[in-house]
Amino acid sequence: MKLSPFGILFLFLLILNVASISSLNPNLNPIYAQETNSQQLIGVNMLGYYTSLPQTRDFKNPFPDNYYDQSFKIIKDGGMNHVRYVYYWESYVKNPTAFINELKFAATIADKYGLKIIYDNHQFHTSSWLNPQRGTGFPNFLFQNNSEYAYGSGGGPKYPSAVAWWTHWWNREITDVNGTDGWTLQSQFLKKVVSTVDSHPSTVGYEILSEPQVHSVDQWDKVGKYNTFLADELRKVTKKDIVYSMSIPVDLKSNIGVNATNLAKMTPANKTNTIFKFSIYGLPSPGSYQEERLNMFIAAGNLSGVPVYIGEWNNVDRDKVINEEGDFVYEINPEESDITPEDTTAILKKFNEIDPYGWAFWYWNFRPHRVENFNLVTSDPSGNLIPTKYFDILKNAVQSVNSGKGSK
């Protein structure tokens, strides 16, 4: 086809106009989108209200007004771009409507501030059924009417009830009263979370389950099958990142084989947009036990061929104590635990050497924690959020260590 001079000029202007529009619209410009999505996530863990309510207890602390707007603004102004949003399955069962509405609201406010959220399906001591005082996680209907894991019998890794329950969980033997297995039930719940927030630009991914318990050598492969099942189910409803977590307990001298090779067995078979999350609660100084653990996690990520994500980090002091079962365990000493500006800077510099997918400090919560350096924010009687000295320490370290650092 032969074009006239006018036709050539028109075609040139049309191409120029389309290019200009694409450069201004991230959705039309794949290069811009790639740069945006490759930005390292740096931020904090965060708890909400209805999304973290245990079934066996309620919160005594009032929920601050404009909690999300205040929080996200402070986090954004502090030079961070990320929130690992901690929620619990049993919180959904307790109040499904309030749970979903809070998720929607949090995602909308995160959009406003340009933050990036990973939604973390969390558990601590398995469930409030096993630990009514402190536990939260799996819903009560997965424990009822079974003498192996009676109410209040202990959900931490050292308790026989927790060992029994997690063993049945990995064998896919936990069911509801209708006989539907727990893996399927959990996938149905996670899909509800995805359908609620997946369309939001602030949503970058979903964590299958935070820090599941492993109690025997044969369970590593079973965790891999579980992660594969959940990841495959989530892939049916989202193209965003899927995060799988390290297990607990993390004792390098234990008889269950806590090493990079076994950790890599937990990786989902489909590694598309898959991330390995681990936690660090100490200074990984040269030659230290924490450095040995950190190196193991990095090696596990390398063996799996997936990026690593430091989904929780802080600095704590642990004491060796005897629990109710007569076993030695290490528990956090609230009085001795602390993190200094020097500690924070050293940890962030170490992270920069690793160049991870991202990291999230533990943590941002409207309820005060007995470990002082776990408190990034407090609230006054009027509901105004007030960052603590630990947020200032984190903010200043981020600014000094990451100044001038752009996209990866």
Where are these regions (language model features)?
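Short, low-complexity, Pro/Ser/Thr/Gly-rich segments in the mature regions of secreted, periplasmic
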Residues: I393-K408
